Amino acid sequence: MLIWLVELADHFQFFNLFRYITFRTGAALFTSALIVFLFGPAMIASLRIRQGKGQPIRADGPQTHFKKAGTPTMGGLMILTGIVVSSLLWADLSSIYVVSTLLVTLGFGAIGFYDDYLKVTKQSEKGFSGKARLGIEFVIAAVAVFFMMQAALSAGAAGSTFGSSVTFPFFKDLMLNLGYFFVLFGGFVIVGAGNSVNLTDGLDGLAIVPVMIASAAFGLIAYLAGNAVFANYLQIHFVPGTGELAVILGAVIGAGLGFLWFNAPPAAIFMGDTGSLALGGLIGTVAVATKHEIVMIIIGGLFVIETLSVIIQVFWFKRTGHRVFLMAPIHHHFEKKGWTESQVVIRFWIIAVILAMVGLSTLKLR
């Protein structure tokens, strides 16, 4: 919204700063962090009163988790408020990529909110029906992917299939054109990303920091992919307009920092599905928009590992009646092995940093 103030640059030189994505990214980060810091305490107090018993604790979970009983959830409302308000202020709302990303973020956030609501009111781990939830998520994601695909096709040269193609790291010219099946592929990527972050959110601070790390990595990717000069130098695919996504990702980092202030152990609030689904969906949408869906598997490798641990556990238990892990997702396995919560969280943060660096290295290895 504030980018329109660039029109005043002829009279007030200061407003020329609003042209630059880097300036607006920094401003978005600061704004979202400030919003969460200022309004966080009031939101936490309100949620604690309204929820009473707070988020239900898994009966089969580690014993150390029972002391968290009564902690309110839906902290994602704080994060989403910071992200959305900051993005509306600093991002270019004429960009279909910005609009699509915010659509997915709010849509997934609403689904997560309803899921949290059911869990709190019923005091049960079972919330929204799994199949129904996945179905609605996929519809939202597919709509966003369709519009982004059309934008990429329109921006490309006549006859170009880039908008409907999947690109691969390490190979600058390798593309797989999926046609309109790209909508299904992109929808799967976004839904998978949302639910992977959701599965990771099981310990204080465990999900939010890797989300910020992935956001920083994809913020750089979005900025580079949206700049013709840098994209040509790195031999990555140029996607006009995606640079604006760096502004949204800056807002994610700022809101994440603000939330971590209250989510640091012992957590005063949990982000809940409201936050984890929305943040995962946001990152997945950026990956699709910038044509780095495969790279997301590396950068978001921690989320992939958490998801695979659940899939393996369920598959093997149904097949043999035995468990591969003491408990899934895998962060609970390590707790059962004797690791303290802080050891699990910090070691997983380290893994997230390493994976993000490996993912970014693919930009130059072509």
From Swiss-Prot:
GO function terms (MF aspect): metal ion binding; phospho-N-acetylmuramoyl-pentapeptide-transferase activity; UDP-N-acetylmuramoyl-L-alanyl-D-glutamyl-meso-2,6-diaminopimelyl-D-alanyl-D-alanine:undecaprenyl-phosphate transferase activity
InterPro entries named in the record: Glycosyl_transferase_4, PNAcMuramoyl-5peptid_Trfase, PNAcMuramoyl-5peptid_Trfase_CS
Subcellular localization, as worded in the UniProt entry: Cell inner membrane
Keyword Cell cycle found: yes
Keywords attached to this entry: Cell cycle, Cell division, Cell inner membrane, Cell membrane, Cell shape, Cell wall biogenesis/degradation, Magnesium, Membrane, Metal-binding, Peptidoglycan synthesis, Transferase, Transmembrane, Transmembrane helix
Pfam families (alphabetical): Glycos_transf_4, MraY_sig1
Keyword Transmembrane: yes
Identification of the protein by name: Phospho-N-acetylmuramoyl-pentapeptide-transferase
CDD domains named in the record: GT_MraY
Family statement drawn from the similarity comment of this UniProt entry: Belongs to the glycosyltransferase 4 family. MraY subfamily.
Catalytic activity: UDP-N-acetyl-alpha-D-muramoyl-L-alanyl-gamma-D-glutamyl-meso-2,6-diaminopimeloyl-D-alanyl-D-alanine + di-trans,octa-cis-undecaprenyl phosphate = di-trans,octa-cis-undecaprenyl diphospho-N-acetyl-alpha-D-muramoyl-L-alanyl-D-glutamyl-meso-2,6-diaminopimeloyl-D-alanyl-D-alanine + UMP
Pathway named in the protein's UniProt entry: Cell wall biogenesis; peptidoglycan biosynthesis
GO cellular component, one term: plasma membrane
Record function comment: Catalyzes the initial step of the lipid cycle reactions in the biosynthesis of the cell wall peptidoglycan: transfers peptidoglycan precursor phospho-MurNAc-pentapeptide from UDP-MurNAc-pentapeptide onto the lipid carrier undecaprenyl phosphate, yielding undecaprenyl-pyrophosphoryl-MurNAc-pentapeptide, known as lipid I.
Membrane topology category: Multi-pass membrane protein
Coiled-coil region(s): none
NCBIfam families in the record: mraY (TIGR00445)
Necessary cofactors: Mg(2+)
EC number annotated for this UniProt entry: 2.7.8.13
Gene Ontology terms: biological process: cell division; cell wall organization; peptidoglycan biosynthetic process; regulation of cell shape
Membrane-spanning parts: 27-47, 71-91, 93-113, 138-158, 174-194, 205-225, 245-265, 268-288, 297-317, 343-363
